[in-house]
From Swiss-Prot:
InterPro entries: Formate_THF_ligase (IPR000559), Formate_THF_ligase_CS (IPR020628), P-loop_NTPase (IPR027417). It is an enzyme of class 6 (ligase). It comes from Rhizobium etli (strain CIAT 652). This is Formate--tetrahydrofolate ligase. Pathway: One-carbon metabolism; tetrahydrofolate interconversion.
Amino acid sequence: MPSIKSDIEIARAAAKKPIFEIGAQLGIPVEQLAPYGHDKAKVSAEFIAAQAGRKDGKLILVTAINPTPAGEGKTTTTVGLGDGLNRIGKKAIICIREASLGPCFGVKGGAAGGGYAQVVPMEDINLHFTGDFHAITSAHNLLAAMIDNHIYWGNEENIDIRRIAWRRVMDMNDRALRSMVSSLGGVANGFPRQGGFDITVASEVMAILCLATDLKDLERRLGDIIIGYRFDKTPVHARDLKADGAMAVLLKDAMQPNLVQTLENNPAFVHGGPFANIAHGCNSVTATKTALKLGDYVVTEAGFGADLGAEKFFDIKCRKAGLRPDAAVIVATVRALKMNGGVKKEDLGTEDVAALKKGCANLGRHVANVRRFGVPVVVAINHFVSDTDAEIAAVKEFVSRLGAEAILCQHWAKGSAGIEELAHKVVELAESGQAKFHPLYGDDLSLFEKIEIIASKIYHAGEVTADKAVRDQLQSWEEQGYGKLPVCMAKTQYSFSTDPNLRGAPEGHIVSVREVRLSAGAGFVVAITGEIMTMPGLPKSPSAERIFLNDQGYIEGLF
């Protein structure tokens, strides 16, 4: 029996086309592409602006059930479906997020898909790529430096150093940096204060880049960032420190979407990368809108399960950008359904139809939740070699009772040939006119009511708790004019609840909001629940331990 090739071996053997040829497939002239080597390029702002009058294609969201720690192949399915749509004669473009170094060297691995459904160059995409994350990190930390510098040189804005909300960021999992005291070492180093680091993908600058429509909108949003409060409790904005212009300069090139290709030489935009458990979890509005102008179908993903990524895609990205999705694909795996049914991770390779049927309650809730937004749904069963016929049949039967269809997909092993049936079904749904998209809640509700609606309708929580300080802060923001903003929930991805160990479809649990943060530039309020951290830590045995350069200088271990 031949050995199974690793993702990196498959990617390295890809017959890539020069990036200018991929651009030509979309009608992008050579002079409107800024190449980064031979296989990736940025699309110019000038070209993007010139497409404004063109009709939009169909927008397809790929989301998932609550995942196992290894992920369920949502990006793989997004890439596979894009290839599948092109295979059946549709002009399809894929839009996914860039990879963060944190999970790449931590536990989850890369973000370029897997098997024979990948975007390439895989190694570049998973590491430094075109430098967007570096630019975002630099812009964020420039503002942090200017805050402390302003205070050092006299504090003209009367910033209360006890109420500075702007932390620093880096693109790495490093729990040691969550809480720290800066400016130690004497008068020459400034005024000591407590602070800390978040991971870059949790940065408001990342969210702003992904929600901004052009450079002018980007600079306006950067200026709207609230870095902290004065002694009279009025907010201090980034523009008060004259930081917004320099930040926009650092982000000028990063605003341009990155064009790459799949293993089957189909176009893909890989741009932006906010996490879905601690941020809004979607690729950039610029990339999505550009793709909609250039393709008949755009396949995009939202991070983690539909309770996080899809809800934020609908309630934040679509609401803010005026997007109207035409269909949604929910990715499910037999192993994740069994885990939601109580099977331990080490036993997931053993057939257990009873546990799987129990775990299907998780899938059923995600189907119902997506339908709440008026979007038609199909379920993609991402096939693993350990799946049995009985288990697959049980999933299909369960989904059919919901009035939907579950389709077995083998794109990981077979590429576009393994996902044709799903591609045809997606076209059927998107062309049916069934989609009647609407957000979950209205703008005029109070911020706490919005949190309660998400918790009750999507998570099926029985109660939302928050101490007086949290409620008072929300009320204060409403009085300052921020009450119409949507809410971005920061929650574990492993459960509908705030307890990562509470699998399946729990009812009546309590959602405890322990902290709220105002992202005035991005245009949402973050509600942090449970034990979720905006700076993750590495696991006991991180992926980094297995990544190295071989004798030929090639990377090994990067999935």
